[in-house]
A protein has these predicted regions:
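Acidic/histidine-rich helix-loop elements
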Residues: 24-30, 126-137, 197
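Glycine-rich, phosphate-binding/catalytic loops in enzymes
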Residues: 39-41, 65-68, 103, 137, ...
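Active site of divalent-metal-dependent phosphoester/diester hydrolases
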Residues: 70-85, 103, 165-203
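Structured beta-strand-rich core segments of catalytic domains in phosphoester-bond hydrolases
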Residues: 2-12, 29, 33, 48-127
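Active-site beta-strand/loop signature of hydrolases that rely on acidic residues for catalysis
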Residues: 22-27, 37-61, 120-123, 142-175
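Structural detector for hydrophobic anchor residues on beta-strands
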Residues: 20-23, 82-84, 107, 155
Length: 203
């Protein structure tokens, strides 16, 4: 996970290549900067936005983006596990799943892009935490069940979200190996995001 290693997912600099931009944001449910977020999304202009910790107020604020992102799927909750996908492209067979717990939703859908269809999973499993879950058992179960399912999917598949894990953990290693997915961070960097108030070296 440093630039010294060969990249696992190559970059495409060819102008004829179709480039898609996916932005994932754990917005922090108590964050009140909803309209600043909307403004930032308009500026960044990703093709897809996956939002985590979405409650009803955040979901309502995102209606301002509907003209640009007419296709959505999600479930807003007030327990820090609401999830929402906004897309410029049509979504098909969209489902909200509860792989391990009824109050921990994930997204499973197909995205149609210029006649081609890819599979998308948006996830936010519960982390091990003294205040939430004393062990990583539920998180690990969700990720490994998903990996087992993905390995049999023939379509191009994307998994995005907040996995509440570090890339060097045994669970992360097994998830990548079992699913057959590639990690775009390999050869580029850790891109650690927590805590965003700290310098990168301390995350």
């Amino acid at each position: 996970f440093t630039p010294l290693h060969k990249v696992q997912v190559p970059s495409h600099d060819n102008e004829s290549s179709r480039v898609l931009k996916l932005l994932t944001a754990n917005i922090l449910q108590t964050n009140e900067s909803k309209y600043e977020f909307v403004s930032q999304m308009r500026e960044l202009d990703p093709d897809f936005i996956l939002m985590l910790e979405v409650d009803d107020k955040w979901a309502e604020a995102m209606l301002d983006l509907e003209p640009k992102y007419p296709y959505t799927v999600g479930q807003s909750l007030d327990n820090l596990y609401g999830i929402l996908l906004l897309s410029k492209y049509p979504l098909h067979n969209s489902k909200i799943r509860h792989i391990v717990k009824e109050d921990i939703p994930s997204i499973d859908c197909e995205i149609e892009i210029e006649g081609k269809v890819l599979r998308f999973f948006g996830v936010h499993p519960e982390p091990p935490s003294p205040t939430e879950q004393p062990t990583s058992e539920d998180r690990d179960a969700e990720l490994l069940r998903l990996a087992s399912e993905i390995k049999n999917i023939k379509q191009t598949t994307i998994v995005a979200g907040d996995l509440n894990d570090v890339v060097w953990s045994k669970t992360s290693e097994v998830f990548v190996k079992e699913s057959g997915l590639f990690d775009p961070r390999v050869g580029r960097g850790l891109f650690a995001k927590f805590n965003p108030k700290l310098p990168n070296i301390f995350r």
